[in-house]
């Protein structure tokens, strides 16, 4: 695995052109409420979808604005006021065909991001959930979010990802998601299979079905 790179840097922008992201995995597995495997193929292997024009006052823009506050609330919820871990944000990890950008990384000691594998404590994934999507969270993080969390753990080596969500303006709620090595391996295999085809194969649903069962 290559050393982590700064999110939104020129290196990050170049790397994402030829790699899937953790947020693509839900769609690739067919469990995303918004995108399908075909959308991922079009985005990464085909003509692609229109890119965001950077407009403000959109759901994505607001998500980025609220993210730091959600992380702060989540860390307090996770460990309390005493013995707060060191929180690192703005870093991405890259492997062949895949790049993950956790919203926050909790480490046991202050460290350079390059040394994180030895000191990493857990990840935090922050979500802003609107009123209309709140039903997806009635039993906890939905499958597409679990796929994202496990993909991040698969690449970083973390053993836990705390999914923190602010649903319909309510206080932040945190769900700890523990690493499942079998699921992580299955997700990495899905990434490998994705890049081995030029077009979406007709049997793709059968290929990913064992991984979906593990979510």
Where are these regions (language model features)?
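Charged, glycine-rich intrinsically disordered N-terminal tails and low-complexity linkers that flank
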Residues: 1-69
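Residues that form generic nucleotide/phosphate-binding pockets
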Residues: 15, 28, 40-44, 77, ...
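Enriched - but not universal
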Residues: 15, 37, 44, 64-65, ...
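Nucleic-acid nuclease catalytic cores
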Residues: 60, 76-102, 106-201
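A structural signal for well-ordered alpha-helical segments within the folded catalytic domains
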Residues: 68-72, 150
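Helix-loop elements that line ligand-binding/catalytic pockets
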Residues: 199, 203-215
